């Protein structure tokens, strides 16, 4: 009984630590170091690579660092809503509920780098926003870090539209 209570307390302490502790981005390969350098030095960066090479993870890590340091006001995350089954309109729920499954991987990356509590705070303050690419036309995002995930599924017109949404002091 004592061991079970102690194990429960230890698990609770680990969860509390995870909730508030941001993680630091570390490049594991030379290509990742080059990608990070490119993001820091340029306003617009396109990255290609095989699945699991860290493209989205690194973009989220740098965005989180910039938000934590107050170097940006907002992180904007989008991706094309490519369906393999029913189209988006036929899915149940409000727009946010419909796009959530598509943006879940990036949400998990940002939670990892910010910690659960900070992620929740920034999300509630709308400093982290998940926007459908299809509804961005006409918007301008100033002082923002913009991530277009899974861009290989975009048309050239969608990529051009996304890049032209960048306002002052955005990357």
Regions found by a protein language model. Give the residues of each.
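Pre-Walker A (Motif I) flank of P-loop NTPase domains
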Residues: 41-47, 143
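Conserved P-loop NTPase nucleotide-binding/switch module
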Residues: 81, 85-92, 158-171
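Short glycine-/polar-rich loops that comprise or flank the Walker A/P-loop
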Residues: 71-73, 143, 167-171
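Interdomain "pre-motor" coupling segment immediately N-terminal to P-loop NTPase/helicase cores
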Residues: 1-15
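Conserved nucleotide-binding/hydrolysis micro-motifs of P-loop NTPases
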Residues: 53, 80-85, 135-137, 152-153, ...
């Amino acid at each position: 009984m004592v061991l079970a209570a102690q194990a429960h307390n230890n698990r609770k302490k680990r969860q509390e630590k995870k909730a508030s502790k941001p993680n630091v981005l570390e490049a594991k390969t030379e290509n990742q170091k080059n990608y990070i350098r490119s993001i820091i030095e340029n306003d617009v960066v396109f990255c290609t690579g095989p699945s699991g090479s860290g493209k989205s993870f690194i973009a989220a890590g740098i965005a989180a660092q910039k938000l934590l340091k107050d170097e940006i006001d907002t992180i904007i995350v989008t991706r094309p809503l490519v369906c393999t089954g029913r189209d988006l309109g036929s899915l149940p729920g409000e727009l946010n509920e419909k796009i959530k499954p598509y943006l879940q991987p990036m949400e998990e990356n940002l939670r990892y780098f910010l910690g659960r509590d900070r992620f929740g705070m920034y999300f509630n303050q709308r400093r982290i926003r998940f926007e459908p690419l299809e509804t961005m036309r006409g918007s301008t995002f100033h002082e923002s870090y913009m991530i277009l995930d899974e861009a290989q599924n975009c048309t050239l017109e969608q990529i051009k539209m996304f890049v032209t949404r960048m306002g002052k002091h955005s990357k």
